[in-house]
UniProtKB/Swiss-Prot annotation:
Alphabetical list of InterPro entries matching this protein: FA_synthesis, Phospholipid_synth_PlsX-like
Record's protein name: Phosphate acyltransferase
Pfam family, one: FA_synthesis
Family named by the database record: Belongs to the PlsX family.
Top class in the EC scheme: transferase
Pathway named in the protein's UniProt entry: Lipid metabolism; phospholipid metabolism
Function description: Catalyzes the reversible formation of acyl-phosphate (acyl-PO(4)) from acyl-[acyl-carrier-protein] (acyl-ACP). This enzyme utilizes acyl-ACP as fatty acyl donor, but not acyl-CoA.
NCBIfam families in the record: plsX
Primary location class: cytoplasm
Assembly and interaction partners: Homodimer. Probably interacts with PlsY.
GO cellular component terms, A-Z: cytoplasm
Source organism per UniProt: Staphylococcus saprophyticus subsp. saprophyticus (strain ATCC 15305 / DSM 20229 / NCIMB 8711 / NCTC 7292 / S-41)
EC number: 2.3.1.274
Places the protein is found: Cytoplasm
Amino acid sequence: MVKLAIDMMGGDDAPGIVLEAVEKAVNDFKDLEIILFGDSSQCTLEHDRVEVRHCTESITMDDEPVRAIKRKKDSSMARMAEAVKSGEADGCVSAGNTGALMSAGLFIVGRIKGVERPALVVTLPTVSGKGFVFMDVGANADAKAEHLLQYAQLGNIYAQKIRGIAEPSVCLLNIGTEAAKGNSLTKKAYRLMEDQHDFNFTGNVEAKGLMNDVADVVVTDGYTGNMILKNLEGVAKAMGKMFKSTLLSSFKNKMAALILRKDLNGLMTKMDYAEYGGSVLLGLNGTVVKAHGSSSAKAFYSAIRQAKIAGEQEIVKTMKETVGTENE
């Protein structure tokens, strides 16, 4: 049985989409228990495997992250993180303030001993629909080469345990594929990754090749990763608008869109971030999943499923044994 703590109040459309996603999750997974943290008066869900714990505070998107976590002790997010820290819950999911959730992860759940910098990881779509693990996308703007090496180790475990890839290929994001390319950070990181035997390092990858299935895991610093992620989101939205405008521009195009509707829906599903769940803060003493702030019920459900798999696969235990220093 896996038990997850859920922030009922986080996100643009909470608690509605959260309750819808939780209801579907407990109905689909008979080995899942949920603790919902939030305003109990707004909870309309009743289920024998769902417990509701009333919180008098909530953290908004406008709150200063660290201050909010430290001052709002009875917020749904802080209480949720405490449940993970105490071991009562195997993991947690929130669509709330990203910075606050990262602060809750660091200051409440805590880092795995030996992990210098936790990293924020996402799974992004590729042309084949397989997707790839990408990190760090914003947990740390600055990074040392040793941090990138740890990111690669964490990402390798994530790809194995969560995505079911037996021997993931791991690449370093760079301005060229040659080993000598890049700045001092990427050159040193390349040497460190090349010298290790913990994962299958296959070299550098350029940004233009990210979505072409060249690697299962791609590693970079949080500053670069966050810009890449936001650029991909922006391009995807712009292309969607252009595509829609073209399809609706004439009767001929509208007829073509009608004929191709099933194929177009399949393409959109392949590229839909909701299929892959949320972003995960790796390197902590518990699973912390961040669903998108504007998540639909479908996207939040995927994030719950993601956290459940992490609990089943004991991903935190594996990271402690592989990357951590607790057993040394």
